[in-house]
Every structure is written in structure tokens, then in C-alpha cells.
UniProtKB/Swiss-Prot annotation:
BP GO terms, sorted: translation
Any one Gene Ontology cellular component term annotated for this protein: ribonucleoprotein complex
The keyword Isomerase is assigned to this record: no
UniProt cofactor note: Binds 1 zinc ion per subunit.
Gene it is expressed from: rpmE
Top-level division of the source organism's lineage: Bacteria
Primary role: Binds the 23S rRNA.
Assembly and oligomerization: Part of the 50S ribosomal subunit.
Name the UniProt record assigns to this protein: Large ribosomal subunit protein bL31
Family per similarity comment: Belongs to the bacterial ribosomal protein bL31 family. Type A subfamily.
Binding site for Zn(2+): C16, C18, C37, C40
Keyword field: Metal-binding, Ribonucleoprotein, Ribosomal protein, RNA-binding, rRNA-binding, Zinc
NCBIfam families recorded: L31, PRK00019.1
Cofactor(s) needed: Zn(2+)
Length: 70
């Protein structure tokens, strides 16, 4: 490997908006501010919403259904 061509790989601090602080190693060179992390992301916390919206056929049937037919 050639010397002097690789970026510095150093320890930085990544701070999440929820207050979680992590020490990570990166070539970025400055501290990071994150929007979400593993402690506050809905997928990892189990508070994920199921957004099961109907498709075009469901909207059509809802709009043009005859009242009292079901």
C-alpha cells in the first residue's frame, strides 16, 4: 500500500436527537449529529406503525359502493 494517500481514520462522536451519544471511528473528521439511531428509530423500538393503505381498487369500491349492499 502507498503511504500518505489514505484519509485519517479517527474516533468521532455521533450524537442523536434523542440524546444518545456514540463513539465511532470514521474518516469524516468531525462530530456528527444524527436524526435517528437504534435507540429511537421506530423499527427498533417496536413502535412502528403499519400504514396499510388501500390501493386504487379499494378506493374505487369505497367511492362507488351501493349503501346497504353488504
Amino acid at each position: 500500500m502507498k503511504k500518505g494517500i489514505h484519509p485519517k481514520y479517527e474516533e468521532i462522536t455521533a450524537t442523536c436527537s434523542c440524546g444518545n451519544v456514540m463513539k465511532i471511528r470514521s474518516t469524516v473528521g468531525h462530530d456528527l449529529n444524527l436524526d435517528v439511531c437504534g435507540k429511537c428509530h421506530p423499527f427498533f423500538t417496536g413502535k412502528q406503525r403499519d400504514v396499510a393503505t388501500g390501493g386504487r381498487v379499494d378506493r374505487f369500491n369505497k367511492r362507488f359502493s351501493i349503501p346497504g349492499s353488504k
